[in-house]
Amino acid sequence: MPVSPIWPAGSAVNAEGEITFHGRTAESLLDEFGSPLYVIDTDEVRDRATKFVHSAANAFNNTVTHVSFAGKALLSKEICRIVTESGMLIDTCSMGEMRIALAAGVPGRRLVLHGNNKSDAEIELAIEQGFNKIVVDEPGEPERIATIAKRLGKRARVMLRVTSGIHAGGHEFVSTAHEDQKFGVALLPAGADAGKLAVLDDLTDVTPAGSNARLGENASSADGSDHSAHAERKLQYDVKYPYDLSHEKVSEGDRRLAEAMTMVADGPALAVLKDIYRRQDVLELVGVHSHIGSNIHDADAFIQAAKRMMLLRKTFLSLIHISEPTRRVVIS
């Protein structure tokens, strides 16, 4: 008979009441391999990895998606092969994990380096092997990565990890989203009024293509005109909008959004993005990343965190456009 759904599909309980894995009893496995013993159902790993990859692609079918396997969960050469064959990248956070993945034949373009205490040797290996990205976890890292990349004559792909202040479930002791925890760079400056981000609740149209978050129709302009008139603005104007508050069609909602953007502009995360941008000869900024917690079923938390990341993205692009209006910048 089958066991609880939490067990792999290949698990069952036989007539004698013994747990079996693909027909092999647990006792026979212990007799052959000894104890303690980890038993991994590779069919289950492959099936789950494939489902995650396909689900992400289907949910966000208007953009490119990457799903990463956290190497810290369990990393062996065979696991590396299975998850990458299923379409996943692999997150590594130590020299050992990096070496295991590379020994399994995983190319650098399928690997990511995480960690809040990276050694120079780990950064150097990631750059040499052309890792998909190095996730910047603290303000001093861009300078270190840039120095090593310059010495190697290469350009490193980097992504910034941001603590968004949104936490999706899980125990407080293992939370990775709060502003005062050890991973990532805070979105807001210390003591900032996070209540100003309530303007994000009114956003109705957030698209990867334009990245211009729109306020709902309830936000009427100062002169009483329909807010939908903003849709007629050309992209060049929109990129710095709503900082240009002198525009005749600026609404109260625009002003609230500008206030939120100004607060983000004063935050640590934006400062690090600007530092990376200044080093673009050796650093390629490929995106921002926020880990909000362990409860993957908390859809509202993911939506709120995504809105905050879009606000950071919009603020960064606005500042770059104002300072260098002719330069085109792409950030995912």
Model-derived features: positions:
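Short beta-strand segments
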Residues: 70, 157-163, 289-291
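Phosphate/diphosphate-binding glycine-rich loops and adjacent basic-rich segments that engage nucleotide
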Residues: 157-160, 164-188, 237-238, 242-244, ...
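Short glycine/threonine-rich loop-to-helix capping motif typified by GTGT followed
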Residues: 297-305
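Conserved beta-alpha junction segments in alpha/beta enzyme cores
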Residues: 238, 246, 267-278, 290
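Midchain, well-structured core segments that form catalytic/ion-binding scaffolds
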Residues: 307-314
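Single conserved hydrophobic/aromatic residue that forms the stacking wall/gate
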Residues: 320-325, 329-332
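A structural motif corresponding to the C-terminal end of an alpha-helix
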Residues: 59-62, 268-285, 315-319
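A charged N-terminal "starter" segment
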Residues: 1-157, 172, 193-207, 212-215, ...
